[in-house]
Amino acid sequence: IGDGHTGPGSSRLRFRLRRERKINWLRATCRDLGWRLTQSGERFAVSVPAEWQELFGGIDGRGGEKTLPKKLLVTLPRPALEGLFDGLLEADGCRMRTGDCYDTTSEVLAGQVQQLCLHLGLAANISQADCYKERDTSFGDKPVYRVHVVRRNLKPEVNKWSGSTGKTRWIEGWEGEVFCAEVPNNTLYVRRKGKPVW
């Protein structure tokens, strides 16, 4: 999804890769899956089996903005979601000692990667990546969204914010109605300015 593209009705995923790390990862993944990979210079093509073509045919949304097919995040088993997450990080992410990041010009895909993290028991925050504001060769003029993957402090806490140590409950004067939301799986997930709360 990160580096690949496909045309409508095509049975081939096409890549243009230069980095040895990405090339090695693509080769290893195709070998593990038993999928055919061909190469011509920097151009690679993967023959996608018929049962996977619907999945890969849905990665380009409006205006060529990459997205995950909507049903993907709710139908894939956890091992497949883990593979998807690893693939996204290999394509457009970076793994650092302080945490993983994923960069994309697709705001929709950034939100979907954040949702993917939730399904994997992780958390993620989205921000506009300052490091790409002065860029010469990548992403064109689209804004870049950076998804910061959070692997620590995943235990839910009430009223947790910077400077809240020791203050978890208080009484607030209020006049007006209070509404309760109920959802089928008892998890309400809300995002405000790229920050998730559930």
Question: For the regions a protein language model found, what residue spans apply to each?
Answer:
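Intein-associated homing endonuclease modules of the LAGLIDADG/DOD-type, together
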Residues: 1-133, 165-198
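C-terminal edge-of-domain segments
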Residues: 145-151
